[in-house]
């Protein structure tokens, strides 16, 4: 005897159920979206490093969440058209995520900084202060960079880096590391304000995939590519 297979029932949402779901979860979704919006709006390195790190985590999680959703759409596609678009979106998302990791690893090899895995930018500014390398992300490679010292506190492009420095500690060159090349900025202007404050302006002078001589005597290290733990 042949058994008759009963098709599985297809569940569909009604308008009333959708409205009920929104009413039940509207407050929670609003709070979550407000939190994400505030983080994305005010997450800058020059304002709060803690908020900026949270922003980077949110941006980083976007890729795996997108890939998961596109794969889910492939498995539960409504029809062949949706399936085709879902497959394309999945492939694009995976390729872009792989490219992100490849570029981040290349930048990490160049700088040795975990900021290389920043999902927002591939530009890392580097400054060597008395043998200690500071690396921080910037959105773009500007034509000039400003380094400021206010009562011993070191700032670069408005980002606080450290304390206990004077104008005499500022190097002649700073760099911006990118995935494929290195940008060198030469100090073009230095002005002292008071006894413990002042600023220096660095102007872009060279672009290429090369190394700078070390400022540390006898160390044999390359200043621009110096590994750091800061």
From Swiss-Prot:
Virion surface side: 1-24, 77-84
Pfam hit, one: CoV_M
Topological type in the membrane: Multi-pass membrane protein
Cellular component GO terms held in the UniProt record: host cell Golgi membrane; membrane; viral envelope; virion membrane
Keywords, sorted A to Z: Glycoprotein, Host Golgi apparatus, Host membrane, Host-virus interaction, Membrane, Transmembrane, Transmembrane helix, Viral envelope protein, Viral immunoevasion, Viral matrix protein, Virion
Record flagged with keyword Glycoprotein: yes
Complexes and interactors: Homomultimer. Interacts with envelope E protein in the budding compartment of the host cell, which is located between endoplasmic reticulum and the Golgi complex. Forms a complex with HE and S proteins. Interacts with nucleocapsid N protein. This interaction probably participates in RNA packaging into the virus.
Protein name: Membrane protein
Source organism (scientific name): Bovine coronavirus (strain 98TXSF-110-ENT)
Organism taxonomic ancestry: Viruses, Riboviria, Orthornavirae, Pisuviricota, Pisoniviricetes
Name of the gene: M
């Amino acid at each position: 005897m042949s058994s008759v297979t009963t098709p599985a029932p297809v569940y569909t949402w009604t308008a009333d159920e959708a409205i009920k779901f929104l009413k039940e979860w509207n407050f929670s979704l609003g709070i979550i979206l407000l939190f994400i919006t505030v983080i994305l709006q005010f997450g800058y390195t020059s304002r709060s490093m803690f908020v900026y790190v949270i922003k980077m985590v949110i941006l980083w999680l976007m890729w795996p969440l997108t890939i998961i959703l596109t794969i889910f759409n492939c498995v539960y596609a409504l029809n062949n058209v949706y399936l085709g678009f879902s497959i394309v979106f999945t492939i694009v998302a995976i390729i872009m995520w792989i490219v992100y990791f490849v570029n981040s690893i290349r930048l990490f090899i160049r700088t040795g900084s975990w900021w290389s895995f920043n999902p927002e930018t591939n530009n890392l500014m580097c400054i060597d202060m008395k043998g200690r390398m500071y690396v921080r992300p910037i959105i773009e490679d500007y034509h000039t960079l400003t380094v400021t010292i206010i009562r011993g506190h070191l700032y670069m492009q408005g980002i606080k880096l450290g304390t206990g420095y004077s104008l005499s500690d500022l190097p002649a060159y700073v760099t911006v590391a990118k995935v494929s090349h290195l940008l060198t900025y030469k100090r073009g202007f230095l002005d002292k304000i008071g006894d413990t404050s002042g600023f220096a302006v660095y102007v872009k002078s060279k672009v290429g995939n090369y190394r700078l001589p070390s400022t540390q005597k006898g160390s044999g290290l390359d200043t621009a590519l110096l590994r750091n733990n800061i």
